[in-house]
Design a protein with these regions (language model features):
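The feature captures the beta-strand-to-loop junction immediately N-terminal to the Walker
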Residues: 107-109
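Catalytic Walker B motif of ABC-type/P-loop ATPase nucleotide-binding domains
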Residues: 231-234
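Conserved ABC ATPase "signature" region
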Residues: 184-202
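Short, small-residue-biased leader/transition segments that mark boundaries at the very start
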Residues: 1-5
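Helix-to-loop junction immediately C-terminal to a conserved catalytic motif
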Residues: 122
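A short, flexible loop at the N-terminus of ABC-type nucleotide-binding domains that lies
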Residues: 70-73, 81-93, 142-144, 183
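Conserved ABC ATPase signature
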Residues: 206-210, 214
Length: 346
């Protein structure tokens, strides 16, 4: 497979499930759908339509690199990226540290560079200049792709493009099975992953009969089954209705708070960021804000200048302040907002 295929195809079920981590894989989509339905836990041979070249990381153990702080899992240093054929940079010297166990939301309008940044976190793209370290491993090190993609799992926008099996539990089993995990361990991982996203009772269902939010939760379960330390979600709710969005955000928040999984959420929905530990705002390939949700959203004029909205509670208090009120713009919750307004009315 070409480097363009390996690094730039972003909405691909193999990248989602981590199988590309094993090497360069090219396949016929229809063949997958015809052959994938087999009993869970039984080894599947690679069909003849695959062209497979194992990474060197499968053949030898390599030492973990250096460069992370004690608490960070991802370190980004002076990251520049230009897409082939483009003159303008998509990322312009971005430097960030992502701490273990944190919930980080990345905001920005279309073309801000947020999705390009996401694709650098598990080596779908590699830097034109600078470096990205995942658990101390440079993403530009092709011999370590397996380690990188075992550490960082990806979930993309369209759940229909991420599901490859005809039964929910078979889909969740796809990645660990092709990583060579033992059948009993696969069974444990699948059951555990589906329970974590509240989809265990649907394990025998056909994915195409599920709602959009349920499909995306199955996609997340497929990543959880790989047992990554980090899950990156690139606008996972973009194609969902409000109910589906709420289901997905509730799921990823629980994974972070209860299981300690690091979550990086790429989104343009302000409401999805309120529960994050940290909000990063991007514009034209640069980071223009990086702080707690309260401090970022209180910069209402900055957000509006970038074509972004703020939570409804912040907008309400901002407008009231323009008319002589004195309300804190850091109260993001409805109950907090109501209490602050009640204080002013006394």
């Amino acid at each position: 497979a070409s480097d363009v295929y390996k690094r730039q195809v972003c909405d691909n079920k193999f990248l989602h499930h981590g199988s590309v981590a094993l090497g360069a894989v090219v396949c016929d989509r229809e063949h997958i759908h015809q052959k994938i339905r087999r009993p869970l836990g039984k080894p599947r041979a690679w069909p003849a339509c695959y062209r497979f070249r194992p990474c060197a990381a499968l053949r030898r153990n390599l030492p973990v690199g250096k460069g992370l702080t004690m608490s960070s899992i991802i370190s980004i240093k002076n990251l520049h990226y230009t897409y082939p054929g483009d003159e303008a940079e998509s990322l312009c010297g971005v430097s960030l540290e992502i701490e273990k166990g944190s919930f980080v939301a990345v905001l920005g309008h279309n073309g801000s560079g947020k999705s390009t940044l996401a694709k650098h976190l598990n080596a779908i793209l590699t830097p034109t200049e600078g470096e990205v370290l995942v658990d101390g491993i440079r993403t530009s090190d092709e011999d370590r792709l397996l380690d990188i993609r075992r550490t960082v799992g990806m979930v993309f926008q369209n759940p229909d493009n991420q599901i490859v099996a005809n039964v929910v539990e078979d889909d969740v089993a796809f990645a660990p099975e092709n990583l060579g995990v033992e059948p009993k361990e696969i069974r444990r991982r699948v059951d555990n992953a589906l329970k974590q996203v509240d989809m265990y009772e649907f394990r025998q269902h056909a994915p195409h009969l599920l709602s959009g939010g349920q499909k995306q939760r199955v996609a997340i379960a497929g990543v959880i089954a790989m047992e990554p330390e980090v899950i990156v979600l690139d606008e996972p709710t973009a194609m969902l209705d409000p109910k589906g969005r709420a289901e997905v955000i509730s799921t990823v928040t629980k994974l972070c708070r209860e299981k300690g999984i690091t979550v990086v959420l790429i989104t343009h929905h302000m409401s999805e960021c309120i529960g994050a530990d940290r909000v990063i705002v991007m514009s034209n390939g640069n980071v223009i804000a990086d702080d707690s949700p309260e401090n970022v959203f209180s910069q209402v004029e900055l957000m509006k200048s970038e074509g972004l909205t703020v939570p409804a509670t912040t907008e309400l208090m901002f407008e009231l302040n323009k008319n002589g009120w004195d309300l804190p713009l850091t109260a993001l919750g409805v109950s907090e907002c109501a209490k602050e307004i009640a204080k002013e009315l006394k």
